[in-house]
C-alpha cells in the first residue's frame, strides 16, 4: 500500500504518507530481519574535494568525518574507499586506518591503478606528464601514445612500479587487518585518452590482473573494475583470465614475484567475483558482461541513470547481480537527468521522515563546520545520497524498495564481506 501512496503526487494524501513512510524507515525489511542498510561500493574518500581542495585551491578544511556522519544518518553502514593509483591506494589505507575509531561506518579500501593513471608505470624522468594523476591528466594524447613503445622497449621502471604495487597488496592482505577488500580500481577507459592511451591501458590492465593471480592470498580477492566505451577489449581480456593462459614473454618479470605463477600460467580462481562499477554501457554491453561469467556483478550510480537509454539498461540488470554506489564526490543525480523524475515523486514524502541536508557553496562551508546541523557542499556527491540511487533503481525495475535494498546489501556483503 505504501508503495502506491508514495508514487502519488496528490498533496491531499500527505496526512497518510507520513505514518507510512515513518513505519517504513523504522521497520525491518519485509525480506529479512535486518534493518535498512546501504553499502556504498564506490567512495573516493581521498579525493581532494573531501579535503576542501577544488581545482588545486583550498576552500575549506577537510570535512570527511562530517560526511561520514551524514552517511550514517541515512542508513549507510559500510563503504569501500577506492584507490586509483599506487599513491592514492596508500592514502586510502592510511585514511581508513586513521578514521577507524571516529567513523560511524565500517570503511574498507581497494588497491589498484585506474586506467586513467597508468602513465605512472612510465619513467617519471620523461617529464611531469608521465606521472599525471586522476586529478591532473597530461591532456596530450600524442604524448600518451608515445609512452607504450618506450615502456615496452625499456620495461625496468614499470617492473619496479608493478613490484611496488604487488608488495603493497601483499602487505595489506593479512588476516588480522581486514580493511583491504578488493583489487581495483582497474580496467579500461576509452573515453579519456587525454589521460592515457589505449595500449598503455590494455597492457597495465592485464599486468594488474596477472598480479591478482600471483599467489593464493591475492587470488581470493574480488576485482573492482572500470569500463568506459571499451566493452569488446574489456571482455576479451577477462575471457583470457577466466579460461587461463600462459604468458611466455613475461615482459615485466612478474614470474619472479609470485611462486604460484612461476610457470607463467594465469587463471582466475573459479569463485573470484568481478564487479564492473559505475556501469554506463549499452544493453549489448550488459549482456556481454553477464554472459561472460555468473560471477560478474554490475554497480550503478547517478552516472548509470542519466538518460532514458541508461534507465532501460539498468532495468535489465538482474537484481541478484546488482550493486549500488555513489562514486562520490562524482556521479550525483542531477535535475537534468532522466532519473530525477523519480526523486521528485518522493521528495515531499521523504521530508516527513527527515529533511534533506542543507547545502552551501564550497567557499561557505568553513563557517558551517562547527554548526550542529550537517551541511553538504553544493554539486559534490556524498554517500548519504545512496537512497536516491536505490529509489530510482527500484522505480525503474519495479522492485519493492525495501526488497531491493536488502538484496543489494546481502549481495555486496557476499562479495566484499560485511
Swiss-Prot record:
Q: Which cofactor does it need?
A: Mg(2+)
For this UniProt record, give its keywords in alphabetical order, as a comma-separated list.
Cytoplasm, Hydrolase, Metal-binding, Nuclease
Main location, first listed in the record: cytoplasm
Q: Which GO terms describe its biological process?
A: apoptotic DNA fragmentation; cellular response to oxidative stress
Q: How does activity depend on temperature?
A: Optimum temperature is 30 degrees Celsius.
Q: What's the pH dependence, according to the entry?
A: Optimum pH is 5.
Q: Which residues bind a divalent metal cation 2?
A: 185, 226, 277
Q: How is the cofactor bound?
A: Divalent metal cations. Has optimal activity with Mg(2+).
Q: What is its EC number?
A: 3.1.21.-
What does UniProt give as GO cellular component?
cytoplasm
MF-aspect GO terms: 3'-5'-DNA exonuclease activity; endonuclease activity; metal ion binding
| InterPro entries linked to this entry | DNase_TatD-rel_CS, Metal_Hydrolase, TatD-like, TatD-type_Hydrolase
Query: Which residues of this UniProt protein bind a divalent metal cation 1?
Result: 185, 327
Instruction: Name where it's found.
Output: Cytoplasm
The record's section on Pfam families has: TatD_DNase
Asked if the record carries the keyword Metal-binding, the reply is yes
The function of this protein is: Has both endo- and exonuclease activities. Incises double-stranded DNA without obvious specificity via its endonuclease activity and excises the DNA from the 3'-to 5'-end by its exonuclease activity. May have a role in apoptosis.
The entry's family comment says: Belongs to the metallo-dependent hydrolases superfamily. TatD-type hydrolase family.
Q: What else is known?
A: Present with 1460 molecules/cell in log phase SD medium.
Enumerate the PANTHER family for this protein. Answer: DEOXYRIBONUCLEASE TATDN1, TATD FAMILY DEOXYRIBONUCLEASE
The protein's name? Deoxyribonuclease Tat-D
The species this protein was found in: Saccharomyces cerevisiae (strain ATCC 204508 / S288c) (Baker's yeast)
